[in-house]
Every structure is written in structure tokens, then in C-alpha cells.
Amino acid sequence: VAGHRTDAWFYAPPTFLKAHWGMSITNAAWLCLHHMEHYRYTLDKEFLKTRALPVLRETALFFVDWLVPDPRSGKLVSGPTASPENRFKVNGKVASLTMGCTYDQEIIWNTFRDFLEACKILGINNEETVEVEASMKKLSMPTIANDGRLMEWTKELEETEPGHRHISHLWGMMPGNRITQDKTPHLVDAVRKSLDYRLNHNYHAQGWSLGWVTSMLARLKEGDKSLDMMQHNYFTKACPNMFVDAHGRPQVGDMMGVPLAMIELILQSHTDYIDLLPSLPTAWKDGKVTGLCARGAFVFDMEWKAGKLISTNIKSLKGGKCLLRYEGKVKELSTEAGKSYCL
């Protein structure tokens, strides 16, 4: 368990002792998931075995012990915890702690999925994998509210800030990938409605939150809106050195959200396919990129004119199948390690 401000000096309590600012217990798990992402980009099995798996194993087994059954449904939920950093109204009062908030459930689902994926790749099947798989099947997952939005909590609760800067409950769409247009289009619609609702209710933007929203819009295939948000971030939050201001100081999340969004406008690889120019903004009608990495250990150079691809060069670092998708058409390449392919 680690709050989002836990650091090398063992600062452990919720930020300023406010539950809605720091009582979220899956933040360390979010960081752990980067181990599996590193493997997906490199296919480095030695890294997977010696670095990623030990971390994923400990994290997954912790949550197997942490989860408890929801007495209403029997499904497993995390808690008590808060959905960073939103609050809700109940019985005329403001509260923040609950059981099974969407943010926690999505990150725990990803943790279980990544651990089981790593074990499958390494040929591991034992009591621990069986236990984790059983818990994963019993997880309570978010549902859609009566107004069509993705629910932030297990009940339909009225948030205190409709335009709250955090979009924690949309984690499963971005940076997670449980929610995709290919497999869960109904949830994608709910994510879009949730995001539109926030943006249309006097959205309380910070530099880092604008970065997250910019990336979310790119993944939602809304390129022009993503670019508008990116430019708004630059003109209102950027410092002269390109750091992004948040509460009078730069934060690392501020600087990473926008570059990620720029990449996702041009290339996305979080599904079974590698999508080329999936969210290209109208203003970027002509362009060229080199050295873009994709999951599966592929490196892309691309050029486009008038919004259309005119050349694509793919270098395969490890070999294997490469599934490309462009304008709804799918092309499968069988590649060899170290070779390049020009389309």
C-alpha cells in the first residue's frame, strides 16, 4: 500500500491528512504495471523473469489477500479507499471513503491480468496462478449509470464537484486497456459521456490533468479535441523551459501526459492491432515521424500527406507477427528479428 505522496522519507499518511487527497491504496500497483509494459515493448524475457515477475507476483498476491466480498453482490472489492480526489454526497453530508471504487478495481484487474500473462509467457502454472485467476473472475467491475456515464463508485452517488480535475474512474480506458472500442464499445461510450460531463461542468484543470485528458481524447480517436486540449495546456500551463505548472510548481505527470498524447495521435498499440494514424488531427495534414516504438518490439518510421499515409517502415526487433490496422483495414506481417519492412 502506498499513497500517491509516499516517498523515500516514508511519508505514509494521506496528503494533509485528507482521505480524498491520499487514501488511495493502488498507486504503487499502478507503478508496478510499468514492468509489464516494458516487456511488451521489448519482449525481453530475461527482464520479465528476473525483474517484472517478482514485482507483479508480490503485488497480485497482496491484492488477493486485500480484497473482501461485497455483501450485496458477493463480488470482491477493494477498500476502504477513495477515488482520487473526488468526493460524494450521502445523507446530506460529504464523504470520500467507500468500497470498490472504479479506480481501484481497474488497477487490480490489470495487476492480475499482467501477472497471469507473465506467468503464461514463462510457462508457470501453479497454486498462485490458480488463486489469482479465481480472484480476478470474482472482481467487481464498474458498470454504467442511468445517465450513461461510467460509474465512479459501486453506487450511483452525486459527486461534490461535477467538473473535478481527476478522471480516475476512466483509468481502464487510459492508461489501462481493459476498455477498448474493439471489445467493449458500450464502455467506451460511457467513458466518452463521463469525460464530456466533466469538461462541460466548469472543469477544474491542472497541467497534469490536462495531460491526462489530452491522452484520453487521443485514445478515444478524437484527434482535433486532443490537439485543442494540448494547445490549451501549452498556452496556459507551460513554463519557459516546457515544464508544466501545477499549483505553482512543476510535476512529472504534467510533462509526460502531452508527449504520450502526441504519440497516440499517430500510433496506438494497446490492443491486438497496431493502429496507424488512429487519431490524426486535421491540422496535422502533412507530417513525418521516425523511431516510434510499438508493443511487440517494433519501431516505426511514417510519413503522410493530406492526412494519408504515403510510406511506412517497420523494424522488427524480435521477430514475430505484426498486425497493422489503417483506415479499418488489417494487414498481417510475418517478421524476422532485425529486419525492416517497407509498406
Q: Which residues are covered by each model-predicted region?
A:
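Acidic/histidine-rich catalytic neighborhood
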Residues: E58-A118
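Structured loops at beta-to-helix junctions and adjacent beta-edge loops in soluble globular domains
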Residues: T81, E156, G176-R178, K305, ...
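Carboxylate/His-rich catalytic cores and anion/metal-binding grooves
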Residues: V1
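A glycine-rich phosphate-binding loop feature that marks nucleotide/adenosyl-phosphate handling sites
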Residues: G79-T81, V132-K138, L277-W284
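Active-site core of glycosidic bond-cleaving carbohydrate-active enzymes
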Residues: W9, P13-K45, T50, C101-Y273, ...
